[in-house]
From Swiss-Prot:
Component of the Integrator complex. The core complex associates with protein phosphatase 2A subunits, to form the Integrator-PP2A (INTAC) complex. GO terms for biological process: RNA polymerase II transcription initiation surveillance; snRNA 3'-end processing. It comes from Dictyostelium discoideum (Social amoeba). Residues 52-63, 1160-1172, 1289-1303 have a biased composition (Acidic residues). This is Integrator complex subunit 5-like protein. Keywords: Cytoplasm, Membrane, Nucleus, Transmembrane, Transmembrane helix.
Length: 1563
């Protein structure tokens, strides 16, 4: 009953399957016949199935109904084959055996539970190998799981059921049934099913087919042939049965080769595994824990046995190892079909050729699948072996402490299997191939080759689209393996729904055309061009980027066999054929009305694919195709043919190149045709866009380049430049309108074919990346390896001479030397491609192709964006090519970097700079250093525009820091190295300020570059370099601790000296910036120089000391006249440079300025414009020697210098100078301003070195223009009013001159005041600068140290050696003038250099430091008291007009900041502009008395908490004291009486301020 139920279920499933497949694969007459014979068919099936265990041979028993109708019996046999869904997939040529994961898991689990098989007539069970051979069904099984299904086929149905029940019981009771070995083995099979499913999901299903005709006699085959002729209605089904027979024969032949190759390895593994299983089962009776471990290991053992022996005998094919019977059957079929062709070829030609081509296609694809499965299987075996070893180690560790038994030994490793690729080459040895190929060759004898290709519709069969690939993948998913009837029927029904009818099958015609080409090469050459090879590129076009096994099979094997007969032809014959073929392609393209570019591209691709298979073809065909495709002639771009020929070492290539030149001369007439061709392509760009097939055509070009231009051929390297030019032209240009030399952005906007452009970009990237990079790596690194290997070989040879037992090593070394020589020869050949490109002309050509983005603000923003994308993609290709060329040599890399920095914009330059330098540094680590040094050496060779772009790019490069998140560490290292190299070339950057090619607005760019280079070098968080301040601290710490000083962490003496010189240069530029007439330019330059100086100095005490020394020396020199101070007739030297009594003062002043500050480049510039030039110093020495040591008589005059003051003038100046001191008590005296006009002009002329000539010229020009305008007005007035008295006119002229002089003096004083403020802010910034240490402006330790240095330098120049008066001495003379020598020296020194008051104001930040200057302050205060007392009548109304007013304010400010005075005296500054001069002297006297009574002491000062809490930096106008003075028992009442009296005298003006000065106290 169970058997009948299974039969009924199978019949219902078959009916559903037939109904589902009516629209796809069934034939109309078969469906009608089924409806008529349904009753008889069901009765026969029931009678046959009622016998139970009857074999399939009972189907052929002598039954009365079957004997009476052999016609029905024959149809029944055929229908059993036709009803199977798996065969339908095969016959529909949809063989892609990748299965779905879900379906594979379901079928695999079903295979473990039931192993029944069904057919259309009976369900049988087999017990012997001969029984399995009688199966008339198709079975789908996984190659990796063959052994799982073999156990089910070797037992009866009852035994299978019993075994399945036992398996389920054993799964629950593993520990109780340890003695039963068979049950344990069954458990292992069940336990491994899930593992096998998981491991084999990626495998491919292989369909094993057994034909019903396999066990039949020759009579049944002849009967089929008979019905093929006499019953044409069954023709297709009979052909399908013949196909099944040939496939069966092929499977047996292939299986026999596997068994022969792997017989030894498989037998040894089986024997070892069996012995190991017995040993494990004997040990299972001892301990339960070890028993469980043994069961687990049995599972692993069985799984490993199945994985290591996948190529054992296939159970489905066991009865057919002797295939002689099948060969006889195939021979009869072959003879009978040839007879049919001979009788009536017109009727049978199409049907037989279609059948033969489809059968060949099936067999070739099955062979490819076997090859792919073999490679996948080997990979899975290695992975599983590693997993098993890990599991064994874990189990050993777990059971080590529990059991006393040693762990079982690991199973033996299997020997490697011979690869199937070796058998693929011998596939023609199979009889199935030979029979079908002989049949096809017989067809070509009957008809010609042309008719054969036309009949086979090659162009249609090879037109592979994405639809066909998708249908094949969907149909293949349904061919999963199953053993039960339910699983097989469900899979077949699901597959039938996904299968769609195909109008045009796809045949494998490669081998057929190969054999036809060997027979008739002259005829097949053109046919393969036009019909076959042009479509091979489409086979490799896969939109999903998956490997197409068919295309790989064709290009690896078939193309080589096609060329076997072509290689025998002479070169002259081939060149004629190639040229004629290209001309034919062009003529066909012109004659085509539709101008189909796709066909033209396919033809070109065919030609290129053919010539790449041999160097002889390349040398002949490549020049032809380049001349036809390129719009330029060969002579224009191949000027270096002789040089390139010298690089080639093969004589064959030289001969071929000569032939190429001859052929190219013959082909010059065809260039016009090609130009017209390209015009047609450009005119039809829009039509190509609309055509979907254009994408395939463009992809075919990609395949051309991958197969042709990326091949390892020396001939290609000879034409490397021309190939890249043709590709570049295809990407970006038109042949008629564009030349490479005059290429612009406007032409790029005309590119309309976006798809062609995109693919061309990909093509150029592929050739640049794959071709150039590999050859460059071989060229760069192979010589080093070869030298090392040669040294090692020499050492080995010397050792072998001493040892006679090392002959084998000598032989190995000789072999290695031979291999290395071969590698060297190959690398030399490959390097020619790079050498031809690495030339100055080629490099500059590719660099000129880099374009800038269009930033025009037009309405069409989308067009601009698209054009910018095109430009970016183009530039990326060129940059990639240029980078590979630059990696070949350091010279070419410098050319590339110098070009991009002077031609590109900043955004593009920064992007390309990092990419190029990163690749160049991989070859040469000193690329940046060489580039920066070479750039600054050749800075004068750049034009104006290039120099500006260069500076802009450098500024952006130094300013923009690569972000750490988006940039790689290599970019940061490149950035830091660039900063270091630029900052070290500060000499060139400073000289660029005076560069003649730069305009005034761009001269400060070099200073900005220098500033950002130092700033980012020391302040960059990602930089490991230390700042100058940190290095100085580390120097001091190491010196104190007496440790070793490492040069890697500390600055060397040379670097310290260079920085000192750089600071001196910048300070010189700061003083020169004070001379600018334009206030805005002056402030701009001053701020730039100041920030740069502060950055480089970086708070270092060493550099601060040198800076203060330079500033103070410059203050006392003539270089700061009219900059910081007014010019002096006879200047007084500071205390540290007192001259001898008779030494001229001019020499002192000149020496003081030139000693420290006058060593820069400005001295040379200033003296270079004099009349006597460089001889000035020598004449001055002679002049001063005559004065000091007179050797000539008094009657003889001295040698006078031009523009030099005479002795009379010098004596007069001295007298005038002493007169000032003698008449100092005169209130009307204005020091240093009441000098004669002529003398002042003469002094100004003599002191021209201190005055900028440009500023004076500008001022003089303004004065002259003003005078000219005034003279014009006078002439006009004279003409109107007549003559005027000469006396009146002279008086007016004198008044005008006086007004002009006053205006000029006021302007000079205003500039001097501004310069003093700027210089004070600069010194104050130096004192308060934190140095980037992160502690703000409150780092009081560093500030106090710098203030101490400033105080010491100040006192060194101000403190005189004269005696110091006491307070009692001053009390006797006040408020009169003091005539003590010390006071006179200090008074005159401060009057000549009023900036010293500002220095005191800076020192007053720390009151402790100002206490050191108390003697100077006393002297200054006494002088100011006496002055205001003397001039009490002259400046009684307005004290502001006095020249001492400003100095008095500065002095009192210093006292207030240092807290030398207390409230209300510290508010007295507010009254100075509102009271009389006499009252000012009274207030100063009160201040004097307070300082006398409460003398300041450093111990009275304590640190200021308010200043430490403030985080904002001080401004330039205010100074925050760092220490506060603590007054104890201070009574201010006696000192405030003077202020109260002044308030009473000015009650109306000062009443509003009284409350602040004298606040009311509340008790």
């Amino acid at each position: 009953m169970k058997e009948e139920e299974t039969i009924e279920i199978s019949e219902k499933e078959k009916d559903k399957e037939r109904n589902d497949n009516q629209d796809t694969l069934t034939i109309s007459w078969i469906e009608d016949w089924r409806n008529e014979e349904t009753a008889t068919k069901n009765e026969n099936n029931k009678n046959n199935n009622s016998d139970g265990d009857s074999d399939d041979d009972d189907y052929y028993d002598d039954d009365e109904e079957i004997k009476n109708s052999r016609y029905n019996l024959f149809l029944e046999k055929i229908l059993t084959l036709e009803s199977n869904s798996n065969l339908k997939n095969i016959l529909s040529l949809n063989i892609n055996f990748k299965k779905d994961n879900k379906k594979s898991k379901e079928t695999d689990t079903a295979a473990t539970t039931t192993t029944t098989t069904t057919t259309t007539t009976t369900t049988t069970t087999t017990t012997t190998p001969t029984a399995t051979a009688n199966k008339k069904y198709i079975r789908t099984n996984n190659l990796l799981n063959n052994n799982n299904s073999s156990s089910s086929s070797s037992s009866n149905n009852n035994n299978n059921n019993n075994n399945n029940n036992n398996n389920n019981n054993n799964n629950n009771n593993n520990n109780n049934n340890n003695n039963n070995n068979n049950n344990n083995n069954n458990n292992n099979n069940n336990n491994n099913n899930n593992n096998n499913n998981n491991n084999n999901n990626n495998g491919e299903n292989i369909t094993y087919i057994t034909s019903p005709l396999s066990n039949e006699s020759l009579e049944s085959t002849e009967e089929c042939c008979f019905f093929l002729v006499h019953l044409p209605i069954t023709k297709d089904l009979i052909f399908n049965q013949f196909t099944c027979l040939l496939i069966h024969l092929f499977q047996i032949e292939y299986n026999n080769t596997i068994i022969i190759n792997n017989a030894t390895s498989s037998s040894s593994v089986n024997s070892l595994n069996r012995s190991y299983n017995n040993s494990n089962n004997n040990n299972n009776n001892n301990y339960n824990s070890y028993n469980n471990r043994g069961n687990n290991y049995n599972n692993n053992n069985q799984q490993q046995q199945q994985q290591q022996n996948p190529n054992l005998k296939i159970r489905d094919l066991e009865g057919y190892q002797d295939c002689s019977h099948l060969k006889k059957l195939c021979l009869t079929i072959h003879d009978y079909l040839t007879q049919l062709l001979q009788r009536n070829p017109l009727i049978w030609y199409d049907s037989i050729i279609n059948w033969s081509l489809s059968t060949l296609t099936i067999i070739t694809r099955l062979l490819i699948i076997l090859k792919n499965n073999k490679s996948q299987q080997q990979q899975q075996q290695q992975q599983q072996q590693q997993q098993q070893q890990q599991q064994q180690q874990q189990q050993q560790q777990q059971t080590k402490n529990k059991t006393q038994f040693p762990p079982p030994p690991p199973p033996p490793l299997r020997q490697p299997i011979t690869p199937i690729s070796a058998m693929v080459r011998e596939r023609l040895d199979f009889y199935s191939f030979r029979s079908l190929l002989s049949l096809v060759l017989h067809l070509t004898r009957i008809f010609s080759i042309e008719t054969f290709i036309e009949k086979s519709n090659v162009t249609q069969f090879l037109d592979i689209t994405s639809k066909s690939s998708s249908s094949s993948s969907s149909s293949s998913s349904s061919s999963s393996s199953s053993s039960s009837s339910s699983s097989s029927s469900s899979s077949s029904s699901s597959s039938s729904k996904t299968i769609k009818p195909k109008k045009l099958p796809i045949y494998e015609l490669g081998w057929i055309l190969c054999h036809l080409g060997k027979k008739n090469p002259s005829l097949i050459l053109g046919l393969t061009f036009n019909h076959y090879l042009k479509n091979i590129g489409l086979n490799s076009n896969n939109n999903n980027n998956k490997v197409n096994s068919k295309s790989q099979y064709i290009q690896d094997i078939n193309c080589f066999q096609i060329l076997e007969f072509l290689a025998l032809q002479p070169s002259s014959y081939l060149s004629i054929i190639f040229q004629q073929h290209i001309d034919k392609i062009i003529s066909n393209h012109k004659s085509n009305k539709n101008k189909n570019n796709t066909q033209f591209l396919k033809d070109i691709k065919t030609f290129l694919m053919l010539i790449t298979k041999d160097d002889v073809f390349l040398s002949i065909g490549l020049p032809i195709i380049l001349d036809k495709l390129s719009p330029f002639g060969i002579n224009q771009f191949d000027n270096n043919n002789n040089n390139n020929n010298n690089n080639n070492n093969n004589n064959n290539n030289n001969n071929n190149n000569n032939n190429n030149n001859n052929n190219n001369n013959n082909n010059n007439n065809n260039n016009n045709n090609n130009n017209n061709n390209n015009n047609n392509k450009n005119n039809n760009n829009n039509s190509i866009k609309e055509d979907n097939s254009s994408e395939k055509d463009i992809e075919s070009i990609k395949e051309i380049l991958e197969k042709v231009l990326l091949g390892n051929s020396q001939v290609i390297s000879f034409y490397s430049k021309r190939i890249l030019l043709v590709l570049y032209h295809c990407c970006f240009g038109d042949s008629n309108d564009i030349t490479f030399s005059s290429y612009s952005t406007s032409t790029l906007l005309q590119i309309k074919n976006q798809t062609r452009y995109n693919v061309s970009i990909k093509l150029l990237t592929s050739i640049v990346k794959d071709r150039l990079e590999k050859q460059l790596i071989n060229k760069l690194y192979s010589p080093i390896l070869n030298n090392n290997n040669n040294n090692n070989n020499n050492n080995n040879n010397n050792n072998n001479n001493n040892n006679n037992n090392n002959n084998n090593n000598n032989n190995n070394n000789n072999n290695n030397n031979n291999q290395q020589q071969q590698q060297q020869s190959q690398e030399i050949e490959n390097s020619t491609f790079i050498n031809n490109l690495n030339q100055d002309e080629n490099i500059t050509f590719y660099l000129n192709q880099i374009q800038c983005n269009n930033n025009n603000n037009n309405n069409n923003n989308n067009n601009n964006n698209n054009n910018n994308k095109l430009i970016k993609e183009k530039n990326n290709i060129i940059i990639k090519l240029i980078s590979l060329i630059g990696m070949d040599s350091i010279y070419s890399s410098l050319i590339i970097l110098n070009h991009i920095i002077s031609k590109l914009k900043s955004n593009q330059f920064i992007q390309y700079f990092y990419t190029l330098v990163e690749q160049f540094q991989a070859v040469n680590s000193n690329t940046i250093e060489f580039f920066i040094n070479d750039l600054f050496k050749s800075i004068d060779s750049f034009s104006h525009d290039d120099l500006i772009t260069l500076l802009n790019n450098l500024l952006e490069l130094v300013k923009i820091t690569p972000p750490p998140s988006s940039s790689s560490p290599s970019n940061l290292s490149i950035y830091n190295e660039t900063l270091k190299c630029i900052s070290s070339n500060w000499v060139v950057l400073l000289k660029l300020i005076k560069h003649p090619n730069l305009i005034e607005s761009n001269k400060m760019m070099s200073i900005e570059i220098l500033y950002h280079s130092f700033n980012n070098r020391y302040n960059n968080n990602n930089n490991n370099s230390q700042s100058i301040q940190q290095l100085e601290i580390s120097n001091n710490n190491n010196n104190i601790k007496k440790k070793e000083i490492y040069p890697s962490t500390l600055l060397s003496d040379k670097e310290m000296l260079e920085i000192r010189v750089l600071l001196e240069k910048i300070l010189n530029l700061i003083f020169k910036s004070f001379k600018e007439k334009n206030s805005f330019e002056r402030l701009k330059k001053f701020e730039i120089y100041k920030n740069l100086y502060l950055l480089i100095c970086n708070g270092s005490s060493v550099y601060f000391s040198s800076t203060i020394d330079l500033i103070l020396d410059s203050l006392f020199s003539k270089k700061t006249d009219m900059i910081i101070k007014l010019p002096i007739l006879c200047a007084l030297s500071p205390a540290n440079t007192l001259p001898p009594p008779n030494y001229p003062a001019n020499l002192v002043n000149a020496g003081s300025g030139s000693g420290n500050f006058g060593n820069g480049d400005d001295d040379d510039d200033e003296y270079g414009d004099d009349e006597y030039g460089a001889n000035r110093n020598e004449k001055e020495e002679l002049y001063f020697k005559q004065i000091i040591n007179p050797s000539l008589p008094l009657s003889q005059p001295l040698i006078m210098l031009p523009m030099q003051s005479s002795l009379l003038e010098i004596n007069y100046e001295r007298k005038y100078y002493h007169y000032k001191f003698n008449d100092m008590n005169n209130p009307n005296h204005i020091p240093f301003t009441n000098k004669p006009k002529n003398l002042k002009k003469r002094i100004e002329n003599n002191q021209s070195s201190a005055i900028d000539t440009t500023n004076n010229n500008n001022k003089n020009n303004e004065i002259l223009t003003y005078k000219k305008q005034r003279m014009k007005k006078k002439k006009q007035s004279i003409q109107q009013n007549g003559n005027i008295n000469n006396e009146q006119q002279q008086e007016e002229d004198d008044n005008d001159d006086a007004d002009d002089q006053n205006e000029q003096d006021d302007y000079e004083k205003y500039n001097i005041l501004n310069n003093e403020n700027d210089l004070q802010s600069f010194i104050k910034s130096l004192v308060l600068y934190d140095g980037g240490g992160g502690s703000g402006f409150n780092n009081h330790g560093d500030i106090n140290d710098r203030l101490q240095i400033l105080t010491n330098q100040f006192l060194l120049r101000v403190s005189s050696p004269y005696l110091e008066p006491s307070y009692e001495n001053y009390q006797e003379i006040l408020p009169k003038q003091s005539h003590y020598e010390r006071d006179i020296f200090i008074r005159n020194l401060f009057q000549q250099n009023p900036f010293l008051y500002r220095v005191l104001e800076i020192i007053s930040i720390d009151g402790r430091e100002l206490t050191k200057c108390l003697e100077v302050i006393k002297s200054l205060l006494v002088n100011e008291i006496s002055y205001w007392y003397q001039c009490r009548n002259s400046y009684s109304e307005s004290p502001i007009k006095s020249s001492h007013y400003h100095t008095t304010i500065l002095l009192v400010k210093a006292l207030i900041n240092a807290e030398f005075i207390i409230h209300p005296l510290n508010l007295s500054l507010e009254l100075f502009d509102k009271i009389k001069a006499e009252e000012i002297s009274y207030i100063l006297t009160s201040i004097w008395n307070f300082i006398k009574d409460y003398q300041p002491n450093p111990s009275q000062y304590q640190s200021s908490s308010s200043s430490s809490s403030s985080s904002s930096p001080p401004s330039n106008n205010t100074i925050i004291p760092t220490f506060k003075r603590v007054f104890s028992n201070c009574n201010t009442t006696p000192y405030s009486l003077t202020l109260k009296a002044i308030f009473h005298n000015h009650i109306k003006e000062l009443c509003f301020h009284y409350a602040r000065f004298f606040p009311k106290k509340y008790y």
